[in-house]
Amino acid sequence: MAGKGSYVPPQYIPLYSLDTEEDRVPAVEENHATRPKLNQDPTQWSSGICACFDDPQSCCIGAICPCFLFGKNAQFLGSGTLAGSCTTHCMLWGLLTSLCCVFTGGLVLAVPGSAVACYACGYRSALRTKYNLPEAPCGDLTTHLFCHLCAICQEYREIRERTGSGSSPAPNVTPPPVQTMDEL
């Protein structure tokens, strides 16, 4: 076999890296310990946790029906359907609130919030990972535990801002002209 050392394998591109020049891995690495670093600086949230009134739409939906807003967030983050996440959130909240009211006479209403916060903080963590966002203002669980509705609204605003949904106008579609067949 002539040219035994002439084969160079194709360039490896990790799935998580960006397709920019500084993030590319060299075809042949001299030192395997030296790897290109991804952008470690987290980007900032597009709005604050208490910026609900900057976006009246998400504020109203989040206050009236947080289950729907949570379902939209979960649907975007890969849960599959809006109905499944929305229903799970609503049923979990309703069931736990009912149980707490029955067993404690309505005295312990913080337990449902903590159970739903445990469920919802996973989606916040997934959103932060997806967009490289800081764990702010507190940890994911703490944020959902004490500011659940505000956290859901913030996550919704972030998804809408990053994906551009809701900000672009609907396309103008015109039907084709009417065509008729004439007899010869």
Swiss-Prot record:
Keywords: Membrane, Transmembrane, Transmembrane helix. It is found in: Membrane. InterPro entries: PLAC_motif_containing. It comes from the Eukaryota. Residues 162-184 are annotated as: Disordered. Signal peptide: none annotated. The keyword Iron does not apply. Pfam families: PLAC8. GO terms for cellular component: membrane. Expressed in roots, leaves, stalks, immature ears, endosperm and pollen. The chain crosses the membrane at residues 91-111. It is a single-pass membrane protein. Belongs to the cornifelin family. This is Cell number regulator 5. It comes from Zea mays (Maize). The gene is CNR5.
